[in-house]
Regions:
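Conserved helicase RecA-like core
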Residues: 1-182
Length: 182
């Protein structure tokens, strides 16, 4: 989903400290710049992670509700509720982290079949109906990642220092193209 959405700055909420650690580890393994915060972290580590998030050193903050209380971070484009919150007010608090200061934002909540009734309670509280989404296909995720890679190459080649050394990169580019051609 993140491969396709390409969020600029996002917060992923997990219900427990263990879930936050699992999600952070998984996102890092997939190449995302992610860090987690929860109640077991010492204050210095929490402050460092929040500072890094605000300063674009990390793109994804994974957090429990308690650890995220009081955070005021602008520019969050996506909120992912990996675990549905335990109370409807927490949901409102979570989604309020995106789309601030007149900016648009998106909130995505993962819901298990046995949680659908609870989702209805949240919809009644927020007075908004949530629409179901189909997960992106592997092909859609691949195409999105390819698009990002091509944009990075274009951006890099806009740099005169790189462009002037194109001949040095040409052989590597041809080799990569041959190596990864299906």
């Amino acid at each position: 989903l993140m491969d396709v959405d390409q969020p600029e700055l996002s917060i992923v909420f997990g219900r427990t400290k263990r879930r936050v650690d699992e999600l952070t580890r998984g996102l890092k393994l997939r190449g995302f710049r992610a860090e987690g915060i929860h109640g077991d972290l010492d204050q210095n580590k929490r402050l460092r992670v929040i500072r890094d998030f605000k300063n674009d050193q990390i793109d994804i903050l994974v957090a429990t509700d308690v650890a995220a209380r009081g955070l005021d971070i602008s520019g969050v484009t996506h909120v992912y509720n990996y675990d549905i919150p335990q109370d409807p007010e927490s949901y409102v608090h979570r989604i309020g982290r995106t789309g601030r200061a007149g900016q648009s934002g998106q909130s995505i909540t993962f819901v298990a079949p046995n949680e659908m009734g609870y989702l209805g309670i949240i919809e009644n509280l927020t007075k908004k109906r949530m629409k179901g989404l189909k997960p992106p296909t592997a092909q859609e995720a691949f195409q999105a990642k390819k698009k990002v890679a091509l944009k990075k190459i274009e951006r890099d080649f806009a740099d005169e220092a790189i462009r002037s050394n194109f001949d040095k990169f040409k052989g590597d580019a041809v080799k990569l193209a041959q190596e990864f051609t299906p």
